[in-house]
C-alpha cells in the first residue's frame, strides 16, 4: 500500500474557512490516470491538485482535476494553492532556475511573482494576454442563469467569450441585486457552452456598494461539475482583459475582484493587465493535513 500526504487549503484568502477550498496531494511520481480521477472525486472539491518536483525539468509540476474527470490547465486557484503550499512548507521548488520563479502545468511554463503579505506568501501567476473570441445572445444566457435581458444590461457592454488560458463567458450584470438573484439552470448553460464554445460563465457587476473592489462576480461551470465556484482565477484574468479593452481599467494598475459572497466563501482575486499578459494574485492558508492510502 502506498501512502501520499495531502493538504487542504483555502485559496484567494488569508483567513481559514473562507476563499476557495483546494485539496493538494504530493506525489513523487506520476499516478495512473484513473487514480487522479478517483482521488479528485473522493475529495469532492471543485478541483484537486497533484504536485511533485522534477529534477529533470528543474521545476515544480502541478496537475489539477475536477470530480467529473476533467483536467484543468489554467492558472487559477488550483495553481495558486499548490504554490502557496510549497512556500508555506518551505519546499525548495525553484532550485536550478537561476533566480527565476516558475512552475510547470500541463507542460507549460507559468511565470510567478512572490512577495510577503500579512505573514503569508502572496503569489502572482501570469496568464496570456486576453483575446475576445466570440459572443453569445443575451436571451440565451439570461434563460440559463434565471435572469432577464434587462438584468444583463451594464454600460452597453456585450456578452463576450474571452480567453487567456481558457475561454470563459463574460456576462455584465446591471447591479448587485440582479447578480444576487441569478439561479443556475445546469442543462441550459451546458447547452449554451457546447453550442458557442465557452467553458464557464462569469457574471459580474461593477455597480455595487463595496468601493474597494473593481467588480463582484459569480462563476458557474456545470459542464465540468462546478455549480458555483467561490474563486476562479482563470475567469478573473479574462475579465480584467475584457474591462481593459473597454477602457474601464488601466494597464499596470492593480485591482481587486470579490467572488464567493453568495456561497459564504468570500474570496479576493487581485488582477493586473500588463503588455505581455495578465497577472492574477492572492494568498492561501493551510487548513488541514492528512494521509491518502492507495
Model-derived features with residue positions:
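Active-site proximal loop and beta-alpha junction motif in alpha/beta enzyme cores
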Residues: 1-75, 80-294
Amino acid at each position: 500500500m502506498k501512502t501520499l500526504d495531502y493538504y487542504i487549503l483555502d485559496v484567494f484568502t488569508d483567513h481559514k474557512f473562507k476563499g476557495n477550498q483546494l485539496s493538494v496531494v504530493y506525489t513523487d511520481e506520476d499516478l495512473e490516470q484513473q487514480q487522479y480521477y478517483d482521488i479528485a472525486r473522493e475529495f469532492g472539491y471543485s478541483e484537486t491538485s497533484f504536485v511533485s518536483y522534477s529534477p529533470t525539468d528543474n521545476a515544480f509540476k502541478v496537475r489539477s482535476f475536477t470530480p467529473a474527470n476533467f483536467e484543468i490547465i489554467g492558472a487559477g486557484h488550483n495553481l495558486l494553492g499548490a504554490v502557496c503550499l510549497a512556500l508555506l512548507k518551505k519546499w525548495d521548488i525553484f532550485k536550478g532556475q537561476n533566480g527565476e520563479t516558475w512552475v510547470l502545468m500541463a507542460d507549460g511554463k507559468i511565470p510567478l511573482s512572490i512577495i510577503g503579505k500579512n505573514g503569508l506568501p502572496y503569489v502572482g501567476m501570469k496568464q496570456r494576454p486576453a483575446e475576445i473570441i466570440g459572443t453569445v445572445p443575451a436571451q440565451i444566457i439570461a434563460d440559463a442563469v434565471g435572469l432577464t435581458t434587462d438584468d444583463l444590461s451594464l454600460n452597453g457592454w456585450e456578452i463576450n467569450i474571452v480567453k487567456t488560458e481558457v475561454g470563459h463567458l463574460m456576462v455584465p450584470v446591471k447591479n448587485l441585486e440582479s447578480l444576487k438573484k441569478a439561479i443556475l439552470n445546469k442543462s441550459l448553460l451546458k447547452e449554451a457552452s457546447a453550442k458557442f464554445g465557452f467553458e464557464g460563465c462569469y457574471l459580474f457587476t461593477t455597480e455595487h456598494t463595496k468601493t474597494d473592489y473593481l467588480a463582484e462576480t459569480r462563476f458557474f461551470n456545470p459542464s465540468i461539475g462546478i455549480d458555483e465556484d467561490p474563486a476562479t482565477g482563470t475567469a478573473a484574468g479574462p475579465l480584467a482583459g475584457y474591462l481593459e479593452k473597454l477602457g474601464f481599467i488601466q494597464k499596470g494598475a492593480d485591482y481587486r475582484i470579490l467572488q464567493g459572497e453568495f456561497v459564504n466563501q468570500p474570496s479576493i482575486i487581485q488582477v493586473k493587465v500588463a503588455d505581455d499578459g495578465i497577472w492574477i494574485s492572492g494568498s492561501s492558508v493551510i487548513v488541514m493535513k492528512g494521509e491518502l492510502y492507495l
